[in-house]
């Protein structure tokens, strides 16, 4: 009850030491579509559920797995409009880095800068935290990277993780299946199986998205490729 008076203030701590608006933002993430990231020995895979709004909806108009540079991509759980703002900011940050240094931005540098943007929205008046968590993958210095950033601006490197709806089940499944010698092909199968743990209804190439990142760069798998992977695990 004592927390209620602080729930509308972003910049004021509650008596228990919480910023309640951040707690609400994390709740938006936990209620969002599940997403999975797995770092393999030779690349990274991102996978997420993509709900079909209507048979009239043009699914090519909006994607959940997005490239930022040739070697970095990301996915989200939470609020789609907030995600698209962060995608735009991430691309702009990557372009600014390239203009200054004439080389692609390292994955860890981009994660740090995007997380700083998210953190600024936890201590400014007249704004609210972003209602998304991001999984950011990349390839540089001859190795793969996977990071998660949450609405507070905190970020961590991961070997494999799940977020969004039923993320606890996803993480438990990954803990049983993951090993550091995993190849990218196996990681793709594992990511899809992890999504399947909490998937409602029939999983098809139209309601999930998968992205991969390796030495060749980042790309989103085509629906035909996703269909083949689904057939392989059926």
Swiss-Prot record:
Q: Which SUPFAM superfamilies does the UniProt entry name for this protein?
A: N-terminal nucleophile aminohydrolases (Ntn hydrolases)
N6-acetyllysine carried by residues: 70, 171
Q: Which GO terms describe its biological process?
A: proteasome-mediated ubiquitin-dependent protein catabolic process; response to virus
Chain positions with N-acetylalanine modification: 2
Question: What is known to happen upon mutating residue 110 to V?
Answer: In a colorectal cancer sample; somatic mutation
Supply one GO CC term from the record.
cytosol
Give a short account of its post-translational modification.
Phosphorylated on tyrosine residues; which may be important for nuclear import.
Q: Where in the cell is it found?
A: Cytoplasm; Nucleus
Q: Which domain of life is it from?
A: Eukaryota
A Pfam family matched in the record: Proteasome_A_N
Keyword terms = Acetylation, Cytoplasm, Nucleus, Phosphoprotein, Proteasome
Q: InterPro entries attached here? A: Ntn_hydrolases_N, Proteasome_alpha, Proteasome_alpha-type, Proteasome_asu_N, Proteasome_sua/b
Concerning Gene3D superfamilies, the annotation shows: Glutamine Phosphoribosylpyrophosphate, subunit 1, domain 1
Q: What is its main location?
A: cytoplasm
**Modified residue annotations for Phosphoserine:** 7, 14, 16
Positions where Phosphotyrosine occurs in the chain: 6, 24, 76, 121
Biological role stated in the UniProt entry: Component of the 20S core proteasome complex involved in the proteolytic degradation of most intracellular proteins. This complex plays numerous essential roles within the cell by associating with different regulatory particles. Associated with two 19S regulatory particles, forms the 26S proteasome and thus participates in the ATP-dependent degradation of ubiquitinated proteins.
Q: How does it assemble?
A: The 26S proteasome consists of a 20S proteasome core and two 19S regulatory subunits. The 20S proteasome core is a barrel-shaped complex made of 28 subunits that are arranged in four stacked rings. The two outer rings are each formed by seven alpha subunits, and the two inner rings are formed by seven beta subunits. The proteolytic activity is exerted by three beta-subunits PSMB5, PSMB6 and PSMB7.
Name it: Proteasome subunit alpha type-2
Gene encoding this chain?
A: PSMA2
